[in-house]
Amino acid sequence: MRNIQIALTKGRLEKHVIPLFEQIGIDCSELKNKGRKLVFQSKNTNVSFILVKAIDVATYVEHGVADIGIVGKDILMENEKDIYEMLDLGVGICKFCVASIPTYNPKSYRKKRIATKYPHITSTYYHEKGEDVEIIKIEGSVEIAPLLGLADAIVDIVETGKTLQENGLIVFEEMYFISARMIVNKAALKTKKDEIFSIINMMEQEILSGK
């Protein structure tokens, strides 16, 4: 069988996804004891893993370095990539929200300034609402922007809401729910069809049996 290379994102999503691979019989022991390594071979299958930053997973898949990738839907929404989105894994569930200080008025007709790491998603959301806003792109922690008067509100991913609460912010609008997705390189889906669909089908059955 041909080798299948899977790109995973480091961090929180990785911890959600490793159990799914183990449940379909793919050994992930090296991943769980990785140290500083970034490339891993499953001991009992033809699968290898690479660990990269979340924003780079889709790029590795698009260019064929990885056959399969596991990435948050937020990355796919913000960055258009020429890949196939095959499966919603149902883990890593979060939501995009509009949040601000308690005195914020989302119904104000004044043009709002919105700080975010996700300008494309934010622009699309407000365009669909028919609302013209100024978007301020921030790379670091966006929670501070309303507190310092840089922006009226923020658009960010919320999981538990603890970070917002600690900074005195509240959610005003829930925009989109997101989760981890399995993506596939278009060429690999033709040349390694059997191997890739075997993983997809087993993963899908595991997800369905767990519901």
UniProtKB/Swiss-Prot annotation:
Q: Where would you find this protein in the cell?
A: Cytoplasm
Superkingdom assignment:
Bacteria
Q: What keywords is this UniProt entry annotated with? A: Amino-acid biosynthesis, ATP-binding, Cytoplasm, Glycosyltransferase, Histidine biosynthesis, Nucleotide-binding, Transferase
Query: What does its UniProt record remark on the domains?
Result: Lacks the C-terminal regulatory region which is replaced by HisZ.
The pathway this protein participates in, as annotated, is:
Amino-acid biosynthesis; L-histidine biosynthesis; L-histidine from 5-phospho-alpha-D-ribose 1-diphosphate: step 1/9
Give the catalytic activity.
1-(5-phospho-beta-D-ribosyl)-ATP + diphosphate = 5-phospho-alpha-D-ribose 1-diphosphate + ATP
Q: Report the HAMAP family cross-referenced here.
A: HisG_Short (MF_01018)
Q: Does the keyword Transmembrane apply?
A: no
Q: What does this protein do?
A: Catalyzes the condensation of ATP and 5-phosphoribose 1-diphosphate to form N'-(5'-phosphoribosyl)-ATP (PR-ATP). Has a crucial role in the pathway because the rate of histidine biosynthesis seems to be controlled primarily by regulation of HisG enzymatic activity.
Show the GO MF annotations.
ATP binding; ATP phosphoribosyltransferase activity
Record's Gene Ontology CC terms? cytoplasm
The Enzyme Commission number assigned here is 2.4.2.17
What is the organism field in this record?
A: Bacillus cereus (strain B4264)
Whom does it interact with, and what assembly results? Heteromultimer composed of HisG and HisZ subunits.
- What's this protein's name? ATP phosphoribosyltransferase
Read off the Pfam families from this record.
HisG
In which family does this protein belong, per the annotation? Belongs to the ATP phosphoribosyltransferase family. Short subfamily.
Matches recorded under NCBIfam families: hisG
Give me any GO biological process, just one: L-histidine biosynthetic process
The organism that produces this protein has a lineage beginning with: Bacteria, Bacillati, Bacillota, Bacilli, Bacillales
Question: Has UniProt tagged this entry with the keyword ATP-binding?
Answer: yes
